[in-house]
Amino acid sequence: MNDLNVLVLEDEPFQRLVAVTALKKVVPGSILEAADGKEAVAILESCGHVDIAICDLQMSGMDGLAFLRHASLSGKVHSVILSSEVDPILRQATISMIECLGLNFLGDLGKPFSLERITALLTRYNARRQDLPRQIEVAELPSVADVVRGLDNGEFEAYYQPKVALDGGGLIGAEVLARWNHPHLGVLPPSHFLYVMETYNLVDKLFWQLFSQGLATRRKLAQLGQPINLAFNVHPSQLGSRALAENISALLTEFHLPPSSVMFEITETGLISAPASSLENLVRLRIMGCGLAMDDFGAGYSSLDRLCEFPFSQIKLDRTFVQKMKTQPRSCAVISSVVALAQALGISLVVEGVESDEQRVRLIELGCSIAQGYLFARPMPEQHFLDYCSGS
């Protein structure tokens, strides 16, 4: 572990002494200390940066919350460990605030301080620093000419991520996702090209390429005895096209596939200011027999409004609720409520982002039946997906 600057923010002198003494035994580098937020701000200004701030929340003078806000604005603090005993609901709200401020939350230290707990949190910090993916700078994104060339050369490929039954892993369907087989950079996810496509109105061209590839795969699945439903992501900009439903119908006819074999996923945020033509397209698709899914349900601010106004046949619950089940008790209440909502509306529910068996078991207890996530399968190219579906 490299040398670290660790700041202990604690107003109770004995607790601060215990923490500093323990940290000096296990942390290579400098251990700084402050009795309140004002002292901590002064330390930040003098030392340049702090790798980890161990922060008590309830202090006289400038408290921990005010210090965290200042730390975010200064850009001089990387990670935060809480050392306050607070109500679980307040704790979760504080964690959310820390993350919204752009700070990395490592965990709770609790009181009294434990050397074993400090060591575990330092190990977590080191692991996150090593594994943290580097943010893609705009300058590193491919040029529009490169993206257009890739589209013209057929370098964008449909990948498939299964939707499965939680209680047995049986295949229910799959989502079709985009990957770019770049000739020099290898397989690239959407984070490398979607921004350019959205900026230069290339999303529609990508959609039709993926849709054609997906329908060809769906026909092969039928031949394998696996006539499952495939879901395609529709960008909000496409919904205003009067020809969208008509062109989808034409391709389904060309591939001799029923409309019920496909579903279209639309994010809630993409429907906030949807024009009448968008609603017309969605109604036409549902009349044809296609499925419609509200993607990332719960991630925005108007999920229930959208669910009432648009003819959805499926809800895809945003992955954040699954990720927070263990640390935020209210997430479980939200999930069980969405289960009841889907049942009352007579539509299906897919839970996204399932990554552990512990999550799978808890979701079953909450009434969920269909899920998608790395626990079951990562997105895969066509041949791997066909092998997956045939059990080979």
Curated annotation (Swiss-Prot):
> Which cofactor is recorded for it?
Mg(2+)
UniProt keywords (A-Z) are: c-di-GMP, Hydrolase, Magnesium, Metal-binding, Phosphoprotein, Sensory transduction
Write down the superkingdom of origin. Bacteria
Activity regulation remarks: Phosphorylation of Asp-56 probably induces local conformational changes in the response regulatory domain. These structural changes are transmitted to the adjacent EAL domain, then the signal is further transmitted down to the active site. The phosphodiesterase activity is inhibited by Ca(2+) and Zn(2+). Phosphodiesterase activity is inhibited by a benzoisothiazolinone derivative that specifically inhibited RocR, but not some other phosphodiesterases.
- Reactions mediated catalytically: 3',3'-c-di-GMP + H2O = 5'-phosphoguanylyl(3'->5')guanosine + H(+)
Oligomeric state and partners?
Homotetramer. Exhibits a highly unusual tetrameric structure arranged around a single dyad, with the four subunits adopting two distinctly different conformations, with only two active sites accessible for substrate binding. Interacts with RocS1.
Q: Any idea what this protein is called?
A: Cyclic di-GMP phosphodiesterase RocR
**Biological source species:** Pseudomonas aeruginosa (strain ATCC 15692 / DSM 22644 / CIP 104116 / JCM 14847 / LMG 12228 / 1C / PRS 101 / PAO1)
